[in-house]
Amino acid sequence: MKPYLAVSIQDCGEPLAPINLEGVKLLKPHPYEILGADYQGRSPYVLRTGVLKRLGQARLTLADIEPTWKILVFDAYRPIAVQQFMVDNTFAEIVARDGLQGQSLTTEQRKNIYQQVYQIWAVPSSNPLTPPPHSTGAALDITLLDGSGQPVDMGGEIDELSARSQPNYYQTAQAESDPQREEFKLYQQRRELLNTMMESAGFLRHPGEWWHFSLGDQLWAWQYNQHHPDRQKIAYYGRVE
């Protein structure tokens, strides 16, 4: 079990509300729905009202730094069933990528594949004490749009299963040429901008994903507590249906 799942939850009871903010765009059609995920009539583009308010604050910070840029929301609320769908889908992708036969996987092979899957996907737990971050309505995956409305190149794709997903990958990556070195520097600066604007509103970034931010869930509280051992917090957003 991941350590953040040991954090206690005392849900504050805030409802979910649609993401409808100036300077914040939604990726449509939703990428998981394209893959076949069934949201059963629910929208992935909702957040707890308190989280939504803070996202608006982050957008204002972005406007101060890059006035023409916008936030693009890739994903937000994710029901447990959709979490399970994406875990299964990614498992199948790895099996196909590695040329394996799904019906004849050994126990060790399955274990290895799930280790890769759970690098970017939380376990689709139905236990209310250990909810996936996105099922709380307090986590979202985002990137940036430039002044022409095009996605800003962040040096990696959202949900990418590679070392490039690490937030500070380009800080330590070895460039093979001066132009590539400048390119890596630009990617790192853009990721730092994304983090700066979200942190200014109280969000904290996932340690292994440059695109994932949350506020008030177990992962957020766990990260906060690592840096403030004398001011421990519990999560105030749990699973929401």
What are the functions of these language-model segments?
Residues K2-W211, G216-R239:
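Cell-envelope/glycan interface and biosynthesis
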